[in-house]
């Protein structure tokens, strides 16, 4: 919905597609600063937490992608910020509910985490009376009523097919089904071991200290910051589909925990040196990855470059409402990029060469996309069967040899590129 709004304001473009992701990413940094400053009344912790959040590059990279993980992380952070603020001013519970609803509307059931974190925080801190606070109950009703309104509307419009596709395929099959990945409870731990440096050891030590303060010393703020990443991490680890960007919602908490851990360890001189060093690293890294050929997660390089190179000729040759064949590519990638840049949809993949040949025989005019290596292998085995329309280092766009005379290369009446 927000992407559609950006399209309406700025026109359809890559900038419009990622506009709100970038805006929400900036909002997360601001919220992290405000939350840390509210909890500890110390600008050093707040500023350090904001800088720590920027690295590793997975956060900045995700903030530049048209995906819902950053909006979800923003609403989770906003909801828990409001929950903490409600300790002294109860009307903040209403914003807690509205932000949770935004999380549910952003990424379905994953948006419920603020409710779960708040519930366990109240239980472990024995705030029984607070659990029935009228404003908190109202906030929860707002979260569930507004958040799940989309489910009701979708069910009323699409019926059982919505239930089957959303809950059956998207959630249960992808998350827990037999055909995704072998079950590995440590999958997210492995992702953090690969991607969360240099902060991982400090965050782990900090989590231990925060857990001790929360459960033994009965410090409410420490308990909440401990439950936030721990609960999300444990629940997400029960699924089979482990992708670190799904856990971006815990990055603000880990950044604050790491910053507070440094604050407790360092004297004033070391603190100033750390901040100066972090700020310098931010500037030098940004300069290095964007002014040199070196490629990294945070590099401001052209996204989906290989798809963009083929998008115009795909659109020229494939009529509207006709799908592009998919030989041995994945189900999702590059499906969305093809749809965005060429206005053409990619079929579900087929894996067997025999099936490809059968479909080409039945429909010689059908056009296909495959990995370039796969196409070269096909071409070497059956050089007379296929005609290569265009290829690059990653993808090959091809058809049958019988269709070569019908391939179009005249772009004179077509807008290029289709999407900037």
What is each of the regions a protein language model found here?
Residues 9, 86, 98, 102, ...:
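Transmembrane-lumen/periplasm boundary regions of multi-pass, lipid-linked membrane glycan transferases
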Residues 18-21, 61-71:
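Short acidic/glycine- and proline-prone juxtamembrane loop motifs at membrane-interface regions
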Residues 19-40, 78:
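Transmembrane-helix motifs of polytopic, lipid-linked glycan transferases
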Residues 31, 71-88, 99, 254-257:
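Specific aromatic-rich, kink-prone transmembrane helix
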Residues 32-55:
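Transmembrane-helix signature of polytopic, membrane-embedded enzymes
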Residues 38-39, 43, 79-93, 262:
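Membrane-interface transmembrane helices that cradle and orient dolichyl/undecaprenyl
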Residues 262-292:
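Signature aromatic-anchored transmembrane alpha helix within multi-pass, membrane-resident enzymes
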Residues 287-402:
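Short periplasmic/luminal acceptor-recognition loop of GT-C membrane glycosyltransferases, typified by
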């Amino acid at each position: 919905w927000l992407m559609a709004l950006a399209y309406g304001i700025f026109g359809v473009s890559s900038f419009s597609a990622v506009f709100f992701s970038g805006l929400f990413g900036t909002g997360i940094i601001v919220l992290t600063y405000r939350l840390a400053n509210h909890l500890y009344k110390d600008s050093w912790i707040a500023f350090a937490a904001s800088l720590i959040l920027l690295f590793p590059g997975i956060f900045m990279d995700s903030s530049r992608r048209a995906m819902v993980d950053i909006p979800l992380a923003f609403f989770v952070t906003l909801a828990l910020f409001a929950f903490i603020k409600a300790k002294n001013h109860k009307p903040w519970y209403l914003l807690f509910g509205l932000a949770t609803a935004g999380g549910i509307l952003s990424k379905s059931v994953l948006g419920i985490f603020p409710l779960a974190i708040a519930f366990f925080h109240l239980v472990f801190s024995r705030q029984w009376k607070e659990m029935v606070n009228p404003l908190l109950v109202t906030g929860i009703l707002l979260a569930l009523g507004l958040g799940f309104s989309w489910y009701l509307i979708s069910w009323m419009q699409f019926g059982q097919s919505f239930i089957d596709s959303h809950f059956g395929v998207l959630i249960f099959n992808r998350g827990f089904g037999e055909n995704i990945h072998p079950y590995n409870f440590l999958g997210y731990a492995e992702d953090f071991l690969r991607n969360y440096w240099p902060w991982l050891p400090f965050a782990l030590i900090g989590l231990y200290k925060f857990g001790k303060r929360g459960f033994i010393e009965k410090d409410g703020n420490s308990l909440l910051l401990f439950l936030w990443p721990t609960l999300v991490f444990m629940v997400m680890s029960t699924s089979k589909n482990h992708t670190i960007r799904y856990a971006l919602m815990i990055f603000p908490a880990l950044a604050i925990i790491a910053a507070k851990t440094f604050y407790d360890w360092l004297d004033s001189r070391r603190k100033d040196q750390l901040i100066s060093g972090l700020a310098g690293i931010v500037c030098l890294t940004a300069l290095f990855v964007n002014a040199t050929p070196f490629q990294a997660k945070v590099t401001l390089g052209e996204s989906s470059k290989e798809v963009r190179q083929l998008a115009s000729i795909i659109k020229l040759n494939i009529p509207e409402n006709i799908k592009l064949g998919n030989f041995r590519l994945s189900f999702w990638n590059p499906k969305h990029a093809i749809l965005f840049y060429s206005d053409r949809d990619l079929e579900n993949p087929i894996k067997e060469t025999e099936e490809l040949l059968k479909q080409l025989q039945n429909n010689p005019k059908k056009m296909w996309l495959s990995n370039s290596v796969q196409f070269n292998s096909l071409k070497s085995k059956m050089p007379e069967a296929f005609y290569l329309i265009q290829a690059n280092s990653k993808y090959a766009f091809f058809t049958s040899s019988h269709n070569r005379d019908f391939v179009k290369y005249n772009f004179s009446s077509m807008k290029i590129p289709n999407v900037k």
